[in-house]
Structures are given as structure tokens and as C-alpha cells.
Amino acid sequence: KPVFEGRFNLGVVSLHLPMILAKARRESKDFYEVLNYYLEMIRNLHKRTYEYIGELRASVNPIAFCEGGLLGGHLKPDDKIKSLLPPMTLSYGITALNELQRLYNGKSIREDGEFALEVMKYINNYTNKIKEEDHLLYAIYGTPAESLCGLQIKQFRKIYGIVENVSDREYVSNSFHCQVS
């Protein structure tokens, strides 16, 4: 019998990793303490989203939920859709991994990606742990977020100003990409 997992993303919330490192430094806190705060915040948002969506009736999207557009999507219009949600993901988005590494030690992830890799392993271990605890399919998502990447620069600059190779362009890099120049 085929197994279908991660065939539908219920939502992604993207971490602004350079902002988290800058905040930790400004507040003289451990980076992972601040990162945990945001990981838990996103976890709680995802759990609320899952519960909210699970209470929706199949009639909100009859092609997907009543006419078989999604695996198991043969519910009656008044049925709640919670039974269809288990194979769907709740994602932690990653942007600006290269800028995180640059802020950490001035090097790109091509020159020295150790800290960036350490952070990704940490987030992966965290999501694996909470998958078991919450029985939800959490995922890590390399955010392809062109408009978000521009917004994140504005947010960073507003608080921390222009930092060379971190916030001196009009956008941060998508997910784990490097700037080309």
C-alpha cells in the first residue's frame, strides 16, 4: 500500500535567522535560547492552525475534500476535515542562511558553513523531537520567498542598521542560497 506523506503544506512560518542572531547578541543571550523562543512560537502557531483547519467542513473545498482531489478526500460536505490532515506538513521556513553565517563570522556558507550547518541540524533535531511529541508532520522548508526576503531586509535595517554582507542589499538570500556578485 502506498504511503503518502507531506503531500500538502498547511502552512509555513519563516525564521529570520540573522535577526535572531542579532537579537541574541544585542540582549547578551545565547543564540539557541532566542532561537528556541521562536521555534516554540511557530510550533504553537502551527498547532493552532492545525486545530482550526481540522474543524473546517469539507464543503470549503469540495473538489479536494469531497470528490477525491486529495488522498481520502471523499467526505460528506458537512464532515470536518481533520481526518485528512495527518499526512500534511507544518513547516519551518528558512531564509538568509548565508547572511546568518556572514553575521556570525564574516564568511559566506561557501567559505565556512559550519555555524549555518550547526543551526540547521539544531532545527532539524528540534522538529524531529516535536513530531514525536505532537504527532504532527513538521518539516523544514527552504523558503523561496522573494517578497519576504525584501521585507526581512527592511525589518533588520530598522533595528540593526546596515551591516556589510548581511543587510547591505535590497533582499536577503532565499533559503540556503549565496549571493551572486
Predicted features and spans:
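Conserved catalytic cores of very large enzyme subunits
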Residues: K1-P86, K107-S181
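Contiguous, well-ordered alpha-helical segments that form the cores/surfaces of helical PPI scaffolds
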Residues: L90-L103, K121
